Amino acid sequence: MSSEHIQNKLALLPDQPGCYLMKDRQGTIIYVGKAKVLKNRVRSYFSGTHDSKTQRLVQEIVDFEYIVTSSNVEALLLEINLIKKHDPRFNIRLKDDKTYPFIKITNERHPRLIITRQVKKDKGKYFGPYPNVYAANEVKRILDRLYPLRKCSTLPNKVCLYYHLGQCLAPCVFDVEASKYKEMQDEIVAFLNGGYKTVKNDLMKKMQEAAENMEFEKAGEFRDQINAIETTMEKQKMTMNDFVDRDVFGYAIDKGWMCVQVFFIRQGKLIERDVSQFPFYNDADEDFLTFIGQFYQKANHIPPKEIYLPDDVDSEAVQAVVPDTKIIVPQRGNKKELVKLAYKNAKIALNEKFMLLERNEERTVGAVERLGEAMGIPTPSRVEAFDNSNIHGTDPVSAMVTFLDGKPSKNDYRKYKIKTVEGPDDYATMREVIRRRYWRVLKEGLPMPDLILIDGGKGQIDSAKDVLTNELGLDIPVAGLAKDDKHRTSQLLFGDPLEIVPLERNSQEFYLLQRMQDEVHRFAITFHRQLRSKTGFQSILDGIPGVGPGRKKKLLKHFGSMKKLKEASVEEIKEAGVPLNVAEEVHKHITAFNEKAKNTEQK
């Protein structure tokens, strides 16, 4: 990644705690770190002088990403999970085989309170993890003084010092009722789950009394215990005190784009996250449901035991997509905070996307020249980019945006309602739009572009070139922008025969193309949404006898997505709770629609 782009990303770092992941040229995570203030810590790598070890790391960094947390403690706990997950080579010397400590109440006849680094399914009660052994021991010391559980690993023949200090009930000598242990365990659980505040208040009173009595050493001990409680009892939303596998979803929307963040919690720990950004076409909640349906179709996305969702999501529809998973819409507590944190990270990522685009807008003149050189054409000072937008062929539209010297010229943007094409025929749509646009350019003597960019591949490019050359007699370079499976700009296609133009993905030229494609896509989507709001969205279920709004909603809820409904048999449609004759009509209608779309695509 270019130094300039790194600087742009550094300028957008938040004043919040979190973890950062440094990547090399291959996109491999080479170092994971934590920070109380992400902005200050990450920037420090790219300024000032460093020792030789740090300098070697910095020389290999070409990109970075970060995860915002709610506290420094969470950043600390998340860091260890990320290091275990990615095993970055620059972290290896700092890593050992130990994990973070937990406080455990053992499942024994005479239970003990111990510190352990291994969490087992042994019916013991575990609390943590804690940032370090010192902090865990400080809390245990407080608990030992408050709750006299046994301290010895094996019972001695006589009472020990702990009994005389009032910190053990001496089960080695006396018969201690199970109910007494149960009472102490309940109080310890309450303490470690928030009741520590009452204990802290009692300690503060004792500290004040000791100070008033000139017992400063004793007051200092109380002070240290209070500080230990405050630093270690902070809520830890990034880790759950169980072994349940969960996926936590949050999403944010802006300018026709959606960002979805998924936190993968495995064995109770946040170990990874997925970030997806894409334009959305329908209502945000509907497209989010579609995303979830597609998400769990991927081989490496196995549905977990639980899924946490935001408030405005149709949980019943999600349940239909992953029937064996428990769907939860948290209303309070740590689970709710996790969903909020996923949303917070999605919003930050989306804002960063647009801010980076705006900052790059000021630095594109050189990129325009280098783009022309890479393509073997004169500098494309005027670029006109096209994109088509429709849903199942309804209300098809196209849009054109113009970039002058690498900057958008919004006065030259154009919108087109498709007039001559029926159904989802992208090639015919492209032919119509190119014909209308450049016939008008010729007629009115408007400026000709130096380059035409098409959102698509060979079929769309050939359609545009055929109209320009054979119908209008124009010789304008036409290139295509292909996308990957995450709807991100992937490659530039140009030439005869078509070839991939070799551009570095982290070059300014590539960012310029990405911005052009994003902008024309946004413009087309916005126009399409405005048009649909006036005419009403015509679903492929509209017009089917016996399928009104209620049954339409029932079908979509049952199948989770239009894609699954399209693949359903008559019997499967009937299982959604509709009569057989209606199921047959739906199947007949969808089959005809699919066949029409298939024939159009083959043409």
From Swiss-Prot:
Show the SMART domains listed in the entry: GIYc (SM00465)
Q: Which InterPro entries match?
A: DisA/LigA_HHH, GIY-YIG_endonuc, GIY-YIG_endonuc_sf, GIY-YIG_UvrC_Cho, RuvA_2-like, UVR_dom, UVR_dom_sf, UvrABC_protein_C
Q: What is its main location?
A: cytoplasm
Record key words, sorted: Cytoplasm, DNA damage, DNA excision, DNA repair, Excision nuclease, SOS response
List the SUPFAM superfamilies. C-terminal UvrC-binding domain of UvrB (SSF46600), GIY-YIG endonuclease (SSF82771), RuvA domain 2-like (SSF47781)
Query: Localized where?
Result: Cytoplasm
Q: One of this protein's Pfam families, by short name?
A: UvrC_RNaseH
Q: Where is the UVR domain?
A: 197-232
List S-S links within the chain.
Answer: none
Note whether DNA repair occurs among the keywords. Answer: yes
List the GO biological process terms: nucleotide-excision repair; SOS response
Q: Which GO terms describe its cellular component?
A: cytoplasm; excinuclease repair complex
Q: Which NCBIfam families match?
A: uvrC
Q: How does it assemble?
A: Interacts with UvrB in an incision complex.
What family is it from?
Belongs to the UvrC family.
Its biological purpose: The UvrABC repair system catalyzes the recognition and processing of DNA lesions. UvrC both incises the 5' and 3' sides of the lesion. The N-terminal half is responsible for the 3' incision and the C-terminal half is responsible for the 5' incision.
The protein's name in its UniProt record:
UvrABC system protein C
Species name for this entry? Listeria innocua serovar 6a (strain ATCC BAA-680 / CLIP 11262)
Quick one: which gene encodes this? uvrC
